[in-house]
Amino acid sequence: MSLQKHGLLFNNNKFSDCKLVLDDGNVQVTLNVHKCLLYMNSLYFQAMFDNFKEQEYSEIKIRVQNSQIATDVIKSFYEKSNVINADWQYQLDYAIETKFFGVEYVLDKNIIVPYIYFDLFVDKIELIGYNNTTLNMILNNLPLDYDLDKFPTDFLEGLLVSSTEYDIFLSNKHCFYVWSVTDNKFTYSKEIPLELYYSYLDNDKIYKFTEHNSLICFNKKTDRHKSILLYDNDKIIKFDTEGVIYYLPENNQIILSHVERTTTGCDYKISLFCLETKQLIRTFHSRNYFGNEIILQISVSHDKIIVFGDDVQVKNFSSGVCLFTINQNESGVCIACDPEWSYFAIGSEDYDTEDQKITIYDLSNGNKVKTLNHRDSIRDILWTSKYIIAHNNENIYFYETNNYELVKKLDYKNNGLIKKIDCFDDSEFLYVLTNNSKMFQINMDSLENTDSNNISTEICFTQIGRFCDFKTIKNSNYHKSKLIKKTLEQRRRMDKN
């Protein structure tokens, strides 16, 4: 029998064999119901009618949290309910009643709760029960200025485990996407009728060059984009679409590669611009020919920038003054800095060099610290607190940071050519993008591929096409996770003392 016909039985009071009284202490509701439908739809009533004397009763009284919402749960046995459009408090109260009656219900985890009701919200979640969904809901609604000392340690640890503080940004020449690691799905996509080149994303802002040498900023929150013109005094800057973009949110500044025509040809520059005034601040690097790719490593807090053109130069970010230079004539140079910005590593993709190597330098003075005997070419390097990670097209190499010894080599020949690797801060996973648009996940403890190692399904591949680039990015829970970690660290220090 359809739900529509069940509804006719209920609304017309046909063939009812039981009066059900729902009482929350303030309001009492009496319903004419059918035991067979209660039994079929509720584990609570199954247990009652199988094991207790109520199976013989014509009237049953039950104490509930909320009589009106409990009534809606019972009515859902007869006709379709529309809970998803209700306010946050109703949805939570409905979930509490479905749990009581043993009725399957999927809670909308995107519920938004007003700041002033957060404590009430947490109390209701406690009645529903803690799981990944409800803990995620709490983290999503947690105010940044909330007193975390109200929560016990195991609860805060549960909040961290239930969610990640990063997402994955992927792009190709006409589109870009955001993949939620927590939800295991794409949560944002944008298609653009222009051919897009190098991009940079910071939280909600995405900066990209287009085929028309213009810079576009996309805002994820508003789902809108705008073109940006930048100037050197009154002269409009022409961008190098094959170059680099590096956005500095703390200063609202952006570093770009651009082209300046001269009487002898062109100067290819890398410069800092203010997005407030749209004006050039300073130029870090200039060359008058298409040469080696310019590589950037930047830390505003450490006041350093590393650029590579004809050689590697370490400069003060604030002044542009060169601190020291390292001769590096090979092509395909890659650079990575340690998390504390005390050292940096230089590797090369040059196949003509007989003895491939990774060299570690001191960032304070440019002195050579260590040379790693690396026999294969290198496309890129990452430096985490635990490993220096290098890769070429087929292999990934893990060197320990405490002794610079090779501890693992992962062969990816059977998975496709490696395009890029990335790891968010010191997270437990390294992500690998291959040329067939497959994304693999490596556990940083075991240094093995995980079982869930491909986020790009065949359907996704058909709809989207090949990805050109990806990056792990902060998500909306990043700052909250940092505050929770800080609170837990303070408690551990207090426990030790």
Swiss-Prot record:
Species of provenance: Acanthamoeba polyphaga mimivirus (APMV)
Disulfide-bond pairs as recorded: none
Pfam families in UniProt: BTB
Lineage: Viruses, Varidnaviria, Bamfordvirae, Nucleocytoviricota, Megaviricetes
Domain BTB: 16-86
Family statement drawn from the similarity comment of this UniProt entry: Belongs to the mimivirus BTB/WD family.
Gene3D superfamilies assigned to the protein according to its UniProt record, in alphabetical order: Potassium Channel Kv1.1, Chain A, YVTN repeat-like/Quinoprotein amine dehydrogenase
Protein name: Putative BTB/POZ domain-containing protein R738
InterPro entries reported for this sequence: BTB/POZ_dom (IPR000210), Quinoprotein_ADH-like_sf (IPR011047), SKP1/BTB/POZ_sf (IPR011333), WD40/YVTN_repeat-like_dom_sf (IPR015943)
